[in-house]
Swiss-Prot record:
Keywords: Coiled coil. This is Uncharacterized protein PM1771. Residues 256-301 form a coiled coil. It comes from Pasteurella multocida (strain Pm70). It comes from the Bacteria.
Length: 380
């Protein structure tokens, strides 16, 4: 049965969340709505009060009566209708209303044919009698100059009760929010407070915003038992309603988000496992390479004849000699950089020790090392 309902009560919204395995509480539903994840609605009932000038309403489930604060919006609505008539974004179907000298307009958005508005107008389109939103309706009186007239609203209307409390008190959790809400609803019928004014809206092709304020019963009205019983009627669980489609969309969004997070987590886990396996393989390969690589041969001691030849080479360089028959560099280039470097360091130390030449600035040492490593030194 719930599947076919356009609006769900608080209890029904909780049951729907259970079907998605979300298991929201009543407090959760109200708190989420206050944060504008989905809209809350109130069921407005018109209460006939005889000669009372302003229409009086009962908000279903909420104690007290309320009265409208504004006169008819007939002229404003007709102005909006004139704009729609010349807008290609809408499809308008007109037909005569049987038994009346007026027309019924069916207006749809061209790109959203589910959004429908039904209007009852005079043949001259200068008087608007009735607007049917499907889930709410507005009855408009015939406008008369200098006579105050008021529209009559019935049905499900968008409520700002929850969002206003969230904005005003900024509660950090559902339990605290419901505490503020209960206090506000208990004290709402205390007059002369701006917080007692409730704002509503009927959303559609033509929006209809309005507000209500507390209505205080007269002594005579309090003697009417039926009226007093309706006035005192209170059921917290039936004050707020929620659009079935809005809840379905929000709950599905949560499920999709959780599935996306789960897939992302699963992917990260698989990636980490794969990387760990690859690291283990690389460590194994590295260990195998270490075991198979031969240790580099250590330099053999420099023979006296090699040292003597290199000494001659260094001395010749130091003295600026360029003998064509001097080819010791070719011999040492073949010995490898490591051995030659060692020989250079030892011979330079010997030369400095015997005082043949001062190499403390490192210039000759550096140049000789560069020449030997690059293989540039050869017989001229």
């Amino acid at each position: 049965m719930m599947e076919n309902q356009e609006f769900l009560s608080l209890d029904e919204a909780v049951l729907l969340s259970n079907k998605f395995n979300l298991n929201f509480s009543k407090e959760d539903i109200l708190y989420l709505s206050s944060l504008d994840h989905f809209k809350a609605y109130n069921n407005i009932q018109y209460v006939y009060m005889g000669d009372v000038q302003k229409p009086v309403y009962k908000i279903h489930g909420l104690k007290g009566f309320f009265k409208t604060r504004l006169e008819t919006k007939s002229r404003l609505l007709l102005q909006e209708l004139d704009i729609i008539r010349t807008n290609d974004s809408y499809v308008i179907d007109k037909k005569k209303e049987q038994g009346f000298s007026r027309d019924i307009w069916t207006i749809k958005e061209r790109n959203n044919l589910k959004s429908v508005l039904y209007l009852h107008l005079s043949n001259r389109y200068d008087d608007l009698y009735f607007i049917d939103y499907g889930f709410a309706s507005v009855t408009l009186p015939i406008y008369e100059e200098r006579v105050k007239k008021h529209d009559i609203v019935k049905g499900m209307v968008e409520s700002t009760m929850l969002s206003n409390i969230a904005i005003r008190n900024k509660p950090q959790n559902a339990k605290l929010f419901v505490s503020f809400l209960s206090k506000s609803l208990t004290n709402h019928y205390v007059p002369n407070s701006s917080f007692d004014i409730f704002e509503f809206n009927i959303a559609g092709i033509i929006d209809y915003p309005f507000s209500l304020e507390p209505y205080i019963l007269s002594y005579k009205e309090k003697e009417d038992d039926d009226l007093l019983e309706l006035y005192n009627e209170y059921n917290f669980d039936e004050i707020f309603y929620f659009k079935h489609t809005d809840l379905l969309e929000y709950f599905q969004k949560i499920i999709d988000k959780e599935e996306k997070i789960q897939k992302s987590y699963q992917y990260q886990t698989e990636l980490i496992t794969e990387l760990q396996g690859r690291i283990a393989e690389l460590e194994k390969e590295n260990q195998s390479l270490k075991e198979n690589v031969k240790e580099p041969e250590t330099s053999k001691p420099i023979r006296p004849d090699e040292k003597e030849t290199l000494l001659k080479l260094i001395y010749a360089l130091a003295m600026g000699r360029t003998d064509k028959d001097f080819s010791a560099s070719a011999y040492f280039n073949k010995k490898g950089v490591l051995k030659v470097s060692t020989m250079i360091n030892e011979i330079v130390a010997d030369l400095e020790q015997v005082g043949i030449m001062n190499f403390s600035d490192g210039t000759l040492r550096k140049r000789l090392s560069e020449i030997l490593q690059m293989g540039e030194l050869k017989a001229d």
